[in-house]
Amino acid sequence: MQHKLLINGELVSGEGEKQPVYNPATGDVLLEIAEASAEQVDAAVRAADAAFAEWGQTTPKARAECLLKLADVIEENGQVFAELESRNCGKPLHSAFNDEIPAIVDVFRFFAGAARCLNGLAAGEYLEGHTSMIRRDPLGVVASIAPWNYPLMMAAWKLAPALAAGNCVVLKPSEITPLTALKLAELAKDIFPAGVINVLFGRGKTVGDPLTGHPKVRMVSLTGSIATGEHIISHTAPSIKRTHMELGGKAPVIVFDDADIEAVVEGVRTFGYYNAGQDCTAACRIYAQKGIYDTLVEKLGAAVATLKSGAPDDDSTELGPLSSLAHLERVSKAVEEAKATGHIKVITGGEKRKGNGYYYAPTLLAGALQDDAIVQKEVFGPVVSVTLFDNEEQVVNWANDSQYGLASSVWTKDVGRAHRVSARLQYGCTWVNTHFMLVSEMPHGGQKLSGYGKDMSLYGLEDYTVVRHVMVKH
């Protein structure tokens, strides 16, 4: 397995402390990787800064060609990437290969095209004898911090728009799941000029802090927890860096009496538990109107009970393990606290799976109340709660009564209600009669403590640029 860092176009061993990388399906150590030293972090940033002098001036066509080559290489090595992701994250191999790899390839291809469509505005004469123009230029060095739930996909979401806009990147994947990012570094080094892409390994304190706080880093992009986002915003404040934050969610799933219950059950069974629920848009906070509450709980409980967790290389496996032992304990604690309320009922699941690996049973909890922690706090595991509501006004207020604002869905056959409710929801995305669907052309991002900035789409590309005014006297 490729375990070296990419700094200034060269694969080099880390000079810092070694950290174990685990297989969450077994709990075994896959390998140990040495972290980047402080000197290597500095070298990576300075290499990116030096490379920016030329990369930032390349044509969109030239940048697009590099991105397309990288997309092709990822596609050609799709099985290798899927196997690494499966071993390091515990994802079902078939899901990694069939779902994630094509989406990752598409992100690079989309931004290759988008790079050639990014324009400033040719304005007019707002002052006599002077012509004004608006430019969208790259910022410089971007420090990108990727999470452990979708390591390669989140690396793609960060690398593609930043590079397409003409920036240079220093990427730090999670120390829990670094293997696909390190493999990507190996394949990218011969496609991009030295220093344009740099990939480091290490923990937040030892590598993340010196990276994000480096004076030559002009922007920090994070997908992670609220706590990590708060830390980075505070840490980077003295140098006034631009920050781009995607900090998780607790998606409300609003099911009205007239909804297609079978579609809801099928949707939540899939979209509430995909990736073992380790998804910031997971359909995890159901609000069911009183007329269909009992029916939905009964049918959804039966459906969730059929979900199969097992070995990642088994084609019949639907849920793999959680990503780490520490996270397994967090999920278990959240469910135990829900049980202890006395009014929340475990419909199915609610316990760790016996044996090796970090497995937690697919869990459905009914009878949850609006103020319960299981409703208000992100669990980030295969755990879905159901809360009864009376009317539209109540459920909109409850759905918005959350520190999160990333994703939501509304299930109803009433078109007017669908438009009315979706317009009032304080979330970056609202799906109607579906959930979880993402495409490269549409923006993904939140509000409130879910963060700000957009991934994917032309809006995502613009986030990695600075708007400049040029005035010419004539």
Swiss-Prot record:
Keywords: NAD, Oxidoreductase. Pathway: Amine and polyamine degradation; putrescine degradation; 4-aminobutanoate from 4-aminobutanal: step 1/1; Amino-acid degradation. SUPFAM superfamilies: ALDH-like. It is an enzyme of class 1 (oxidoreductase). The active site is at residues 246, 280. GO terms for biological process: L-lysine catabolic process; putrescine catabolic process. Its EC number is 1.2.1.19, 1.2.1.-. NAD(+) binds at residues 146-148, 172-175, 209, 225-228, 280. GO terms for molecular function: aminobutyraldehyde dehydrogenase (NAD+) activity; NAD binding. It catalyses: 4-aminobutanal + NAD(+) + H2O = 4-aminobutanoate + NADH + 2 H(+); 5-aminopentanal + NAD(+) + H2O = 5-aminopentanoate + NADH + 2 H(+). InterPro entries: Ald_DH/histidinol_DH, Ald_DH_C, Ald_DH_CS_GLU, Ald_DH_N, Aldehyde_DH_dom, Aminobutyraldehyde_DH, PatD. CDD domains: ALDH_ABALDH-YdcW (cd07092). PANTHER family: ALDEHYDE DEHYDROGENASE-RELATED (PTHR11699). Homotetramer. 4-aminobutanal can spontaneously cyclize to 1-pyrroline, and 5-aminopentanal to 1-piperideine. Catalyzes the oxidation 4-aminobutanal (gamma-aminobutyraldehyde) to 4-aminobutanoate (gamma-aminobutyrate or GABA). This is the second step in one of two pathways for putrescine degradation, where putrescine is converted into 4-aminobutanoate via 4-aminobutanal. Also functions as a 5-aminopentanal dehydrogenase in a a L-lysine degradation pathway to succinate that proceeds via cadaverine, glutarate and L-2-hydroxyglutarate. Belongs to the aldehyde dehydrogenase family. Gamma-aminobutyraldehyde dehydrogenase subfamily. This is Gamma-aminobutyraldehyde dehydrogenase.
